A protein has these predicted regions:
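Core dinuclear metal-dependent hydrolase active-site scaffold
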Residues: 2-72, 122-190, 194, 276-327
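A short helix->loop->beta-strand "cap" motif at the edges of active sites that frequently abuts
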Residues: 33-34, 105-111, 233-238, 262-263
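Short, Asp-centered acidic motifs that coordinate Mg2+ and/or phosphate
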Residues: 34-35, 76, 202, 237
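Short loop/turn segments at strand-loop or loop-helix junctions that form parts
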Residues: 38-43, 81-84, 113-117, 200, ...
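Glycine/Thr-rich phosphate-binding loops of Rossmann-like dinucleotide-binding domains
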Residues: 45, 87-88, 213, 248
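Active-site metal-binding motif and surrounding structural segment of the metallo-beta-lactamase
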Residues: 51-109, 198-204, 211-212
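Short, electropositive alpha-helical surface patch
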Residues: 89-109, 138-143, 253-270
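Internal alpha/beta domain cores that form substrate/cofactor-binding pockets in large enzymes
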Residues: 157-198, 202-261, 268, 273-275
């Protein structure tokens, strides 16, 4: 993979849908800080009635190793919210990032998160587990600045009427301004205004979940488009991924948005200068191209089978993806 460098700031997108997994994980290096944001990934457990294909599991394994490496190097870790594709989990399924992998690793790292009174009950339990296992308190970060980082007040996870849960956005400034929006889905106008007030050069944002039309009204889809247009006019590099890139509808949407602005509108893989690896969107074809025997997932969960066979198969079948570029 490649880093995007701008003077004293390096940005690495580690795990998101265009890189083969669910998440919005990145690592930002400044002169004095190494900041890991949303250190967790997952795979859509059931899509089109199919469990994750072993090739996608192979990609997931490699990205998890990278998160462990970046956790060990970080001065700061930011958790925007406590959903299973953004954090280490005590009760992880085989395709999520298990907290056991980072126990005792980098004990002095600072961990920044939402204020406790803005947590959903499910999030509260996960914070308790995280604090107990890591043996450290999480720092309430909303609205404060520390070094290169500034944190937002809570904004809605998607639209305010869809979901009462919230996320925390992060601004990092060093020569340029980078903003990680977390799962705003471009549905909250106030979140968009906050981003623009921060005057960013580069934004990594979650786009609308177009792959779930039953959960996204026509009015919401229009609002997401309007907000994407607002950002694309003002932000030099707008990276849209996560929910947006779970289906080919999102790919077409991104292409249309890019064609209507002079600024750079791309996905995470484009930013990292590697081929797009839209593995969830193409799960059906993965099974057609590389059949999976019955019982594979159960055996994998018990540690009886691995993924190397499928990784090597995919390298031959999907040469345009260049899987080794993603290692």
């Amino acid at each position: 993979m490649h880093f995007h460098k701008s003077d004293n700031m390096d940005i690495e997108i580690i795990g998101t849908e265009s890189l083969g997994v669910r998440g919005l994980c990145c690592f930002v290096t400044t002169a004095k800080q190494r900041i890991l944001i949303d250190p967790g990934i997952a795979l859509g457990y059931n899509r089109y009635g199919l469990l994750p294909h072993p090739f996608q599991v192979a990609v997931d394994e490699r990205i998890q190793k990278k998160i462990v490496q970046r956790w060990s190097e970080a001065t700061d870790i930011v958790i925007s919210h406590f959903h299973g594709d953004h954090i280490p989990l005590a009760d992880a399924n085989p395709y999520q990032f298990n907290i056991k992998k980072i126990i005792g690793l980098n004990p002095d790292v600072r961990i920044w998160a939402k204020n406790p009174h803005h947590l959903h009950p499910i999030e509260e339990k996960r914070v308790e587990f995280l604090s107990a296992i890591l043996k450290k308190d999480l720092i309430a970060a909303e609205g404060i600045t520390h070094g290169a980082m500034t944190f937002s007040r809570p904004v809605f996870h998607g639209g305010k009427h869809n979901n009462p849960q919230t996320v925390m956005m992060t601004r990092i400034e060093e020569d340029r301004v980078f903003v990680h929006t977390s799962d705003i889905q471009l549905l909250d106008n106030e979140a968009i205004s906050q981003i623009l007030d921060w005057e960013p050069d580069i934004v990594l944002a979650d786009g609308p979940p177009l792959y779930m039309p039953n959960k996204l009204s026509k009015e919401q889809a229009k609002r997401a488009w309007r907000n994407a247009k607002r950002l694309s006019k003002e932000v030099g590099t707008l990276i849209l991924d996560h929910h947006l890139m779970r289906g080919y509808e999102g790919v077409r949407w991104l292409k249309r948005l890019s064609s209507e602005t002079e600024n750079n509108v791309i996905c995470g893989a484009d930013f990292m200068n590697v081929p797009r690896m839209l593995l969830e969107a193409r799960r059906k074809s993965l099974y057609e191209d590389m059949p999976v025997p019955a019982g594979w997932h159960e055996a994998y969960g018990k540690g009886k089978v691995g993924t190397d066979h499928y990784w090597n198969l995919a390298k031959g079948i999907y040469k345009s993806m260049n899987p080794d570029d993603h290692r």
